[in-house]
Amino acid sequence: MPTPKDALQDRLGYRFRRPELLDEALTHRSVTGPDNERLEFLGDGILNFVIADELYHRRPDATEGVLSRLRATLVNGRTLAEIGKGLDVGTALRLGGGEMKSGGQRRKSILADAVEALFGAIYLDGGFDPSRETILRLYRDRLASLPTEAELKDPKTRLQEHLQAGRRPLPRYEVLEVSGQSHDQTFRVACRLQDAAVTAEGEAGSRRKAEQQAAEQMLKRLEDKHER
């Protein structure tokens, strides 16, 4: 039966010649000794370049702003965490006792950091070409289904444009509830339209994100109403 690290290399499609680099990439800072933060820094730079280069050639007519937003959707922590989960990186991570007990092997930020560290480790182990090939292989499906320019806009902007197109008043956002400790708060926000008895709510760890969720829900309601 393969070890977690062997299985991870199979899923990556890359076999390390220097196993110590793989070990370092999978070592969280909660473990005493060398950790993966420097490799994460390196991998972040490589990832951003590879994705920028690929987008530049895939979208020859896109403006700099569109390319930047496309790249942001691909290299953000959420996407990296999804990739890490798909690779089952958590089973191979080295975590301190406290981090392990608190479920660190499933924490999105830790998975995202480890994926970037793996990109950096592959670059040091095999050079730029293998790191580029690995990144593009892991991003193949996402690159094949890039969002349109309209889809790149955040929900609040899309809702505003939708209402302006119909010459309707802009929405109001109201904080309904703030719960949790000061370092871990949850915001519940309502999005209300002035000319209709329609309200949508969003809930997230920041007011801004909760407003975006509420705007997204409002857009869905307006679209559903339009289709009926």
UniProtKB/Swiss-Prot annotation:
Q: Where does Mg(2+) bind?
A: E40, D113, E116
Q: Region (Disordered) spans which residues?
A: 200-228
- Top-level EC class as recorded in UniProt: hydrolase
Q: Is RNA-binding included in the keywords of this UniProt record?
A: yes
Q: Which BP terms in the Gene Ontology apply to this protein?
A: mRNA processing; regulation of gene expression; rRNA processing; tRNA processing
| E.C. code | 3.1.26.3
In this chain the RNase III domain maps to 5-127
Its cellular-component GO annotations read:
cytoplasm
Catalytic reaction annotation: Endonucleolytic cleavage to 5'-phosphomonoester
Q: Which SMART domains match?
A: DSRM, RIBOc
According to its UniProt record, where is this protein located?
Cytoplasm
Matching entries from PANTHER family are given as: RIBONUCLEASE 3 (PTHR11207:SF0), RIBONUCLEASE III (PTHR11207)
Q: Assembly and interactions?
A: Homodimer.
Query: Which protein family is it in?
Result: Belongs to the ribonuclease III family.
Give the protein name, as stated in the record: Ribonuclease 3
Source species of the chain: Alkalilimnicola ehrlichii (strain ATCC BAA-1101 / DSM 17681 / MLHE-1)
Name of the coding gene: rnc
